[in-house]
From Swiss-Prot:
GO molecular function: 2 iron, 2 sulfur cluster binding; 4 iron, 4 sulfur cluster binding; iron ion binding
Cofactor annotation remark: Binds 1 iron-sulfur cluster per subunit.
Gene3D superfamilies found in the cross-reference section: HesB-like domain (2.60.300.12)
Name of the molecule in the record: Iron-sulfur cluster insertion protein ErpA
Single GO BP term: iron-sulfur cluster assembly
Superkingdom classification of source: Bacteria
Organism field: Photorhabdus laumondii subsp. laumondii (strain DSM 15139 / CIP 105565 / TT01) (Photorhabdus luminescens subsp. laumondii)
Cofactor(s) essential for the protein: iron-sulfur cluster
Protein's job: Required for insertion of 4Fe-4S clusters for at least IspG.
Binding site for iron-sulfur cluster: C43, C107, C109
Any Pfam family: Fe-S_biosyn
Subunit structure: Homodimer.
InterPro entries reported in the protein's UniProt record: FeS_biogenesis, FeS_cluster_insertion, FeS_cluster_insertion_CS, FeS_cluster_insertion_RrpA, HesB-like_dom_sf
Length: 115
């Protein structure tokens, strides 16, 4: 018997999905998806980026949760395997965050890392 549980290379939390749902509703464009990507830069060599995108490009991976989608390009995904996209609210403010087991060091800002 096969399991219905599919292990995804990147997790997308309920908190993040709920926030995306609210933001997409505010924009009044149901085709928007949260795209997470990695660029060179930041104090540790790489940094995470988040944007809303209404396009899915060839090779992109999508994760659907609660009626919204997270999109990751293949180049970024290789650095994010095993990670988790979450949304947090605290004294420092509210933001999407990535927990990345591949990051050897991270910066105090939380958005920069090295591998």
């Amino acid at each position: 018997m096969m399991s219905d549980d599919i292990v995804l290379p990147l997790q997308f939390t309920d908190a993040a999905a709920n926030k995306v749902k609210i933001l997409v509703s505010d924009e009044e464009n149901p085709n928007l998806r949260l795209r997470v990507y990695i660029t060179g830069g930041g104090c540790s060599g790489f940094q995470y980026g988040f944007t809303f995108d209404d396009q899915i490009n060839e090779g992109d991976m999508t994760i659907e949760k609660q009626g919204v989608e997270l999109v990751v390009d293949p180049m970024s995904l290789q650095y994010l395997v095993g990670g988790c996209v979450d949304y947090t609210e605290g004294l420092e403010g509210s933001r999407f965050i990535v927990t990345n087991p591949n990051a050897k060091t991270t910066c105090g800002c939380g958005s920069s890392f090295s591998i």
